[in-house]
Amino acid sequence: MKSLLFGTPCSCAIFILVYCIITLFIWFLYTDNLSNAIVDFEYFSIKNLGELGKEAHLQMTETDLVDAQLQNEKYQYNAWLSERIPLKRTLEDYRDPQCLKINYSSEKTVTVSIVIAIQQEHPHTLLRGIYSVITQTSPYLLKEIVLVHDGHPDLDLIRHIHHKLPIVIQLEMESSKGIIHARLTGAGVATGDILVFLNGHMEVTRGWLPPLLEPILLNNQTVTEPIVDAISRESFAYRKLVEPEQLAFDWQLDHIFLPLDQHSWNSLPKPYPSSQLEGRVFAIDRKWFWHLGGWDEGLRDYGGDALELSLKVWQCGGLILAVPCSRVGIIYKRDELEAQMAPNRNPSLQVQKNFKRVVDVWLDEYKLHFYRYNPKLRNLTAESLDKPRDLRRRLNCKSFEWYRSQVAPQIRNHFLHAGLTNYPIGKIMPFVAPHFCLSIKGGFPVIRKCHSTNFEDWTLTSRCQLKHGNMCLDVDYKNNVRATKCTKKLSKNPWHYNYQHSSFVSNGNKCLQIDVNKVGLILSACDSDVTEQRWMFTKVQDFKLDHMRDICLSVNH
């Protein structure tokens, strides 16, 4: 009997070995399945909770309250409740009925890449947004969703997306480099004709994409932005914005919201020009985005990126349209709201530096008005601005004065004239001939005897031009001083008045000099000992008292 059960000692050893191998194989297979198990993010979901964008409320135990508080501190919204709202909840159609009558030509003509950059995003909230994109977007349009995990990725989330959502391309940053850098990384991988940037806590609504694409198909230098509604941080209720608004900014770069101009209001629901992107959700032609250089690589973490891209788009030949027939709901997180706060009120030093970069590159001489309201930012150090300035010159972008006067006249009427200094206006007289004045005759600058009227008055303009009527003093490539018709573009040879030496300086360190022999003007290397380079500007004392005599010294072209 014993031999039948175990056989020889050799047979017994073989039996034990086979048993161990099978056991180990089963154990490894089981543990591997455990480690790669797909988390069911619908485990806690309650059917119809939050359906149609309605408020969601649940009774909570003490344990639930503690858990909810911890998650709220981490994610800045009610993540506990989000776990109980279905990932594929439906929302109402919030569009104007007129939108339903519009036929769009975008389907089957372009492809779209959605770019989402996240930092420690709550998985359920992110997935709900991704599912809304997939269910509310035509498969003919949606080429891919590029999801960039900016440091500390959630492995369960990554695994779920990998197995359940093959349309999503996931990129993992080894360390957090900020949302701006993550967005640039995602855009670099995207291959669709049009890029649509979203954030990780939003939901799109029915018919949201074609209205954003249509204006871009008509003009690929158009950037479009939907009407951004709010999703409650506490109840996840979808709250429709009652009336479209115009986003603007003041001299502190704080957001202000203005009513639409009458023409835009009467044309609703047609798209209308917007002076600035809110920046959380927008669409842009991929080639045009990279033609503009994307975002300034010197912008770190977050903040200032929406303003930078807005000014870049407008000043470099594009336009921004708000699209009422496209609606997207956003959860407004506290840190994102802080990132868009005026830099003088912003607690983040990096955000302050970001805004300073934008100001120094794009606001031209008007940056001095910004510094009057934000003096502590004047002396902040920032990385080299050579690249964004070179890009601006290469693209032949327009001046901020053009933006102020042409893009946002309504905004100008509200605030862009507020706080502006009156620039010096007066006669310009050479020290060597104090009874003579600088003037223009026959299109040429001349020195002639002064009149008692204002006929010889000159203005040192906000664009650092010496202006007389509609003519400006300019310098040609041979350093000859001439008079040309003033333009709204930035001068290649800006002028400033050196109060200490009473000289007008342009074209580097060259000074306006009277040629006594020819009774004309030349441009020579500045020399404080040369009396012919000294000029009396009759209103310069008032200018000095306003602490802005160096206005053109600090302008960087």
UniProtKB/Swiss-Prot annotation:
Q: Does the keyword Lyase apply?
A: no
Q: Which gene encodes it?
A: pgant11
- Topology class, membrane: Single-pass type II membrane protein
**Free-text note on domains in this protein's UniProt record:** There are two conserved domains in the glycosyltransferase region: the N-terminal domain (domain A, also called GT1 motif), which is probably involved in manganese coordination and substrate binding and the C-terminal domain (domain B, also called Gal/GalNAc-T motif), which is probably involved in catalytic reaction and UDP-Gal binding.
Question: Ricin B-type lectin domain: which residues?
Answer: 456-557
Region ranges (Catalytic subdomain A): 109-215
Q: What does this protein do?
A: Probable inactive glycosyltransferase.
Q: Which UniProt keywords apply?
A: Disulfide bond, Glycoprotein, Golgi apparatus, Lectin, Membrane, Signal-anchor, Transmembrane, Transmembrane helix
Picking any one GO biological process from the record gives: protein O-linked glycosylation
Q: What name is this protein filed under?
A: Putative inactive polypeptide N-acetylgalactosaminyltransferase 11
